[in-house]
Design a protein with these regions (language model features):
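A short acidic (Asp/Glu
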Residues: 16-17, 46-49, 129-133
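Short beta-strands within extracellular/lumenal beta-sheet-rich domains
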Residues: 3-31, 99-107, 135-136, 188-189
Length: 189
C-alpha cells in the first residue's frame, strides 16, 4: 500500500493531485536561466557562437541522424531560429571555472504551452591557435506564482534530446562516448 500526504500548503494541495500542467495564467513569471563560460584560448576569435530558440521547430526523428542534422542546419539557413544570445553578448575572455561564468536570463511567458527547441551553435577556428572550450551550464526554468511561491525546473526535466553535429569527427573529448555519439553528450548535464 502507498500513502500520499497532502499538507494543504502551496504545491501540496489535494485538489491538484491529478493535475499535469498549470494554466499559464496562474504563473506570474517564468524565466529561463543558464550560464556560459569559456576555458582556454581566446573566445573572441571563435568563428561563430549563438544560442537560438524556436517554437516552430518540428522536432527530431531521434533515429535518423542524417535527417535530423539536415533539419537543424536547414532551419538555421532559413533564418527560423530566434537568437537568444547573439555572438556579441558572449563572454570575450576565458575564465578559470563556472563560478566566473556569465549568467543569462530570458522571459519564457511567450512560450508557455508551446513546444520549444534550443540550439547552441559553436563553430571554432582552425587549429593554429588554442581552441576555447565552451561550457553551457546551470540551465533551469524558474516559475513564480502570484502567491510568491517559486518552482525551479532543471534542464534534466525539459525532455530535450541533444544532437551532436560533430559526432563523426572523432574529437578527443568524445573518446569516452562508445555508443550513441549522434544523440549523446560528453557530460551528464
Amino acid at each position: 500500500d502507498f500513502l500520499t500526504f497532502f499538507s494543504g500548503e502551496a504545491g501540496s494541495k489535494y485538489e491538484y493531485r491529478e493535475r499535469e500542467t498549470i494554466d499559464p495564467s496562474q504563473i506570474k513569471s517564468s524565466m529561463l536561466n543558464f550560464s556560459i563560460w569559456f576555458q582556454y584560448g581566446n573566445p573572441s576569435t571563435t568563428l561563430e557562437k549563438h544560442v537560438y530558440i524556436s517554437d516552430e521547430f518540428t522536432g527530431l526523428y531521434k533515429d535518423n541522424f542524417e535527417a535530423d542534422s539536415l533539419l537543424v542546419e536547414q532551419f538555421e539557413k532559413d533564418g527560423k531560429w530566434k537568437e537568444l544570445v547573439p555572438q556579441s553578448a558572449f563572454p570575450t575572455a576565458a575564465v578559470g571555472n563556472a563560478d566566473l561564468a556569465t549568467p543569462y536570463s530570458f522571459d519564457m511567458k511567450e512560450y508557455m504551452g508551446k513546444r520549444i527547441a534550443i540550439a547552441i551553435c559553436y563553430r571554432g577556428i582552425d587549429n593554429t591557435v588554442a581552441q576555447s572550450k565552451m561550457y553551457f551550464e546551470r540551465m533551469r526554468i524558474n516559475n513564480v506564482m502570484p502567491s510568491g511561491q517559486e518552482a525551479e525546473y532543471s534542464a534534466g526535466s525539459f525532455g530535450f534530446t541533444p544532437i551532436n553535429m560533430k559526432n563523426k569527427w572523432n574529437l578527443k573529448d568524445q573518446t569516452s562516448m562508445t555508443k550513441d555519439r549522434e544523440y549523446g553528450t560528453v557530460t551528464n548535464n
